[in-house]
Amino acid sequence: MKYEMVIGKDFRYNVCRKGVEHIIFTDEVAPKEKGVELEDLSNDFDGSVVGWIKDGTYKVSTQTKGQKVIFNEDSSYMFHERIGSYIKSIDFNNIDTSHVTNMRGMFAFCENLEELDLNNFDTSNVIDMNNMFDGCSSLTSLDLRNFNTSNVYKCQLKNVQF
């Protein structure tokens, strides 16, 4: 198993639900209780990455202790607009972004996000960060200290104010 997620746009369509305000990337095992439905979010559709909703939180997990969720090479528009208007927080503690090359529009129009902790992002292979934070009107804190932009050739930030 590769534990790699679907492309960003496909993830966005799976998560788009009213009532989901938080997203957590984890390695915890999904609860086996009535009303909790698992969605296969793995790129190979092998169940290595699954998602479920519980109490307004969408959890994305490998269900394997110590195994991080590997973001797809194309993670563009992952949290863009369609879900962005609902999401208040995203916990990126259990992720691997080392294979990502495209982060275009990743957080664009996440209107309710106030802060983003992206310290766990490995951006060393990213070439496109264009409009990554476009329209994030509530964003007041954004820590990009660990961003390696040496390979980025597209990075336009418009309508972003800090």
Protein language model annotation of sequence segments:
Residues M1-F162:
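Negatively charged
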